[in-house]
């Protein structure tokens, strides 16, 4: 079967990435199934200062947004550079994956990925210092993400 025809038989025209949530409650098959049906996106590389309104303005261009959950530092309860965007339909979420991934928001190139669906508690960063793990060890200075990485600041 040709590559073009494969798209006709797939669940989605937007591929699911290799990333899997290590804290997912269930087996890999269940997670894959949810990812292929989901209307929820993970959005990463946001500035700590990006507002929910800015996220909504961008993502609403692709369809009706059900809700936005801003990721929070689990200790400080301040934004920590990611969010979840829920759409009412898979088709609208696919549009966002196609057209928003890799674009600029608040002077940062953002990335989107499928999410199996938001569950309470997932809005908190999983890093040791409360934020995102990727911000723990960052060597470069990034004012939009709190300066240097948390572990570098402690050295």
Swiss-Prot record:
SMART domains xrefs: RRM
Chain sites annotated for binding mRNA: 19, 42, 111-115, 122-126, 132-133
Keywords tagged on the record: Cytoplasm, mRNA processing, mRNA splicing, mRNA transport, Nonsense-mediated mRNA decay, Nucleus, RNA-binding, RNA-mediated gene silencing, Translation regulation, Transport
CDD domains per record: RRM_NCBP2 (cd12240)
Biased composition (Basic and acidic residues): 133-143
Every RRM domain range: 39-117
Annotated InterPro entries: NCBP2, NCBP2_RRM, Nucleotide-bd_a/b_plait_sf, RBD_domain_sf, RRM_dom
Pfam assignment, any one: RRM_1
Main location: nucleus
GO cellular component terms given for this protein: cytoplasm; nuclear cap binding complex; nucleus
Chain spans, region Disordered: 121-155
Molecular-function GO term, any one: mRNA binding
Subunit description: Component of the nuclear cap-binding complex (CBC), a heterodimer composed of ncbp1/cbp80 and ncbp2/cbp20 that interacts with m7GpppG-capped RNA.
Functional description taken from the UniProt entry: Component of the cap-binding complex (CBC), which binds co-transcriptionally to the 5' cap of pre-mRNAs and is involved in various processes such as pre-mRNA splicing, translation regulation, nonsense-mediated mRNA decay, RNA-mediated gene silencing (RNAi) by microRNAs (miRNAs) and mRNA export. The CBC complex is involved in mRNA export from the nucleus, leading to the recruitment of the mRNA export machinery to the 5' end of mRNA and to mRNA export in a 5' to 3' direction through the nuclear pore.
Family: Belongs to the RRM NCBP2 family.
Name of the protein in question: Nuclear cap-binding protein subunit 2
Species whose genome carries this gene: Danio rerio (Zebrafish)
């Amino acid at each position: 079967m040709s590559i073009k025809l494969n798209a006709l038989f797939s669940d989605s025209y937007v591929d699911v990435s290799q990333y899997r949530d290590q804290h997912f409650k269930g087996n890999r098959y269940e997670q894959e199934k949810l990812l292929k049906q989901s209307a929820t996106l993970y959005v990463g590389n946001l500035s700590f200062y990006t507002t929910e309104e800015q996220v909504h303005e961008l993502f609403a261009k692709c369809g009706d947004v059900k809700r936005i959950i801003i990721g929070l530092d689990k200790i400080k309860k301040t934004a920590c550079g990611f969010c979840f965007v829920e759409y009412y339909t898979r088709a609208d979420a696919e549009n966002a994956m196609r057209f928003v991934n890799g674009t600029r928001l608040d002077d940062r190139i953002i990335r989107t990925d499928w999410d199996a669906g938001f569950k309470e508690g997932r809005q908190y960063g999983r890093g040791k210092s409360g934020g995102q793990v990727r911000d723990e060890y960052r060597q470069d200075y990034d004012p939009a993400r709190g300066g240097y990485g948390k572990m570098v600041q402690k050295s």
